[in-house]
């Protein structure tokens, strides 16, 4: 199972860690663009805010002008023309940042980040010293956090992607592959 592979990973890294997944985020969107992207030539036209590190370098390697910057700098950079397109996270956080105010084309499922996990870790020594009841309590709490986080993200991101074909104000809607969101 996934949990067994997760535990095996810590062993292979030589770490005495007991980890619990408590808050997954993802998948992240490809991002926001001023015009539709029909092929890689369209994509390569933009100065694109991407995550730093391997994702940013990967985009550069395929010919994308990748620019790394913090989340709070993205909207001002878009408004100033420092960048032309951007990715941040997923529907709810992206709309909260207001990217839809300046970019109207949003593409889901990015190339760079399928999932991010916020985990809870304790040392194996500490975990092994716990009673069976304490271990079970920790497992139940982690699973409850995981379930709550997943359901919240599905609900909130889904609400941000409510589709309508007859948007009241086309200028305030966002194109999602021929469908509109307001």
Task: List each language-model region with its residue ranges.
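Residue-level preference for long, well-ordered alpha-helices that form the structural scaffold
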Residues: 1-2, 149
């Amino acid at each position: 199972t996934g949990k067994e592979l997760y535990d095996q990973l810590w062993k292979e890294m030589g770490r005495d860690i007991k980890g619990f997944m408590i808050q997954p985020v993802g998948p992240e969107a490809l991002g926001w663009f001023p015009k539709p992207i029909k092929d890689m030539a369209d994509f390569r036209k933009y100065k694109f805010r991407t995550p730093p590190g391997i994702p940013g370098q990967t985009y550069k390697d395929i010919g994308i002008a990748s620019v790394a910057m913090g989340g709070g700098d993205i909207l001002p950079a878009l408004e100033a023309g420092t960048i032309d397109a951007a990715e941040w996270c997923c529907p709810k956080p992206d709309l909260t940042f207001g990217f839809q105010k300046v970019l109207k084309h949003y593409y889901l499922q990015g190339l760079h980040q399928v999932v991010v996990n916020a985990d809870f870790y304790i040392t194996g020594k500490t975990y092994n010293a716990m009673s069976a009841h304490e271990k079970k309590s920790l497992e139940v709490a982690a699973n409850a956090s995981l379930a709550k986080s997943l359901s919240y993200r599905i609900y909130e991101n889904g609400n941000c992607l409510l589709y309508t074909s007859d948007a009241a104000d086309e200028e305030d809607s966002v194109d999602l592959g021929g469908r509109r969101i307001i």
